[in-house]
Amino acid sequence: DLGIADASAVGLVGLIGAGSVFGRFAIGGLADRMGRVPAIVLMQASMGLAFLAWQGAGGYAALAAFALWFGLSYGAVVSLMPAICMDMFGARAVSAILGTLYTGAAFGNLLGPFAAGWVFDRHGSYAPVIWGCVALSAIATAASSMLLARRVPAY
């Protein structure tokens, strides 16, 4: 806890949302140039690096930079998933697959803040949560990288 006022802290959540909106739109052009799978690998890695920036944040400006960076990366991943699922599994399966993926994400979004608060209450720090996020991002990046060996259309 860095002693940031509640209203300012809530503003950081808005910055995550703003970054996410930008990431959802901006990734299209990048994915068209480099391919969807390389783009999602890049964005998964970017998200992990954003978590590292969060770990080192010492004030509001650094947290704001993290919020925008994380939002951009997260928004890009969210927007790429439907297209990659369509490329890999076709139209017949995409609805069920996306429903499963986004339901899993919803549980994470619902339970994550409670888990982070619980960890903070026990350890007095968010560091274990942040390092957990870094580890999960590394796993997601590695899993996404495995798709590079598959023949998935660029668009």
Identify the meaning behind each predicted range.
Residues A50, A61-W69:
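Paired small-residue
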Residues L30-A31, A115-G124:
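Interfacial helix-cap and linker-helix signal at transmembrane-aqueous boundaries
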Residues D1-A7:
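Short amphipathic helix-loop junctions that connect adjacent transmembrane helices
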Residues P128-M146:
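Symmetry-related core transmembrane helices of the 12-TM Major Facilitator Superfamily/SLC fold
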Residues G17-A18, A106-G108:
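Short hydrophobic/small-residue motifs within alpha-helical transmembrane segments
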Residues R33-Q44:
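Cytoplasmic membrane-interface "Motif A"-like loop-to-helix N-cap segments
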Residues A76-F89:
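Intracellular juxtamembrane helix-capping segments at the cytosolic ends
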Residues S46-G58:
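C-terminal ends and interior cores of transmembrane alpha-helices
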